[in-house]
UniProtKB/Swiss-Prot annotation:
The keyword Transcription does not apply. It is found in: Secreted; Host cytoplasm; Host nucleus. This is RxLR effector protein PITG_07555. GO terms for cellular component: extracellular region; host cell cytoplasm; host cell nucleus. The keyword Repeat does not apply. Belongs to the RxLR effector family. It comes from the Eukaryota.
Length: 170
């Protein structure tokens, strides 16, 4: 469930960053010619929200509009954690009643940081964690896609990011 909340936060950040990106001020608008053609093809296709990724219309793929994704996220953030748990039928941990998804995400981050602080006090370094979890071997044998799904690799990356961003005196 912690990973789910982190995914929601990342999704929200990427959606808001995409919304703020403006192609109108780009000094080279020809860069977007291919996207423009694809956009016009979708509009000619009955104003449906589709994009043709291939020349074969049978392999057409539906795309969720950014506005509907942001709308869904806004509705989700207003719900309590119990409501979200019942929606997804997960219920991995149960915070106090009335806790919102944002508060649960903050709680998850605080627990993760506390765990990393304890690892740091136990003299765990990114190098020792990399050796313990055999990360070098995984990097050599696994694809990038497989590494992104490996929990040990994800934990190592999160701990390394934490380690790099914390000042030595903290």
């Amino acid at each position: 469930m912690q990973a789910y909340h982190l995914l929601l936060v990342c999704m929200y950040i990427s959606c808001s960053a995409y919304t703020n990106a403006s192609t109108a001020e780009d000094p080279n608008p020809n860069t977007y010619a291919e996207f423009s053609r694809m956009s016009h093809a979708a509009k000619d296709n009955g104003e449906s929200n589709r994009a043709l990724r291939t020349h074969n219309p049978d392999r057409e793929e539906r795309m969720m509009s950014l506005a509907s994704l942001e709308n869904w996220h806004a509705k989700l953030m207003g719900k309590t954690f119990e409501q979200v748990n019942s929606m997804f039928n997960k219920g991995k941990f149960n915070p106090p009643k009335g806790t919102t998804v944002g508060q649960a995400t903050d709680w998850t981050w605080s627990k993760t940081i506390a765990f990393f602080e304890q690892m740091k006090k136990d003299n765990t370094t990114p190098e020792s964690l990399k050796e313990t979890l055999n990360i070098a071997q995984k990097e050599a044998t696994m694809s990038a896609k497989a590494l992104r799904k490996d929990p040990d690799y994800l934990m190592y990356n999160a701990f390394k990011t934490f380690w790099d961003n914390k000042s030595p005196g903290v």
